[in-house]
Amino acid sequence: MAPQTFALWLLLVGTLLGQGCCQHWSYGLSPGGKRELDGLSETLGNQIVGGFPHVETPCRVLGCAVESPFPKIYRMKGFLDAVTDRENGPRTYKK
């Protein structure tokens, strides 16, 4: 009974992994991840433009009208790394 149960589990796991790892073809996607470029701009261009509401006033949440928050985060991280390097000395990395 154990070999039959083990074979059933292998079949089930193989089926689930096969479904999870397979490529989903949509919007003219061909094998190998290539797309037909002729109709792609027409198809996706209308969705992208129509998908975002047009706002007349600039965004004021977290100052995103001036600058995205991500560069600020990376500059702050660089500043904090420089300060900790001054206090603790340069970092040594093990291979």
Curated annotation (Swiss-Prot):
Keyword Ribosomal protein: no
Modification sites for Pyrrolidone carboxylic acid: 23
GO cellular component labels: extracellular space
Record-listed Glycine amide modification sites: 32
Keyword terms of this UniProt record: Amidation, Cleavage on pair of basic residues, Hormone, Pyrrolidone carboxylic acid, Secreted, Signal
Protein family according to the UniProt entry: Belongs to the GnRH family.
Protein name per UniProt: Progonadoliberin-1
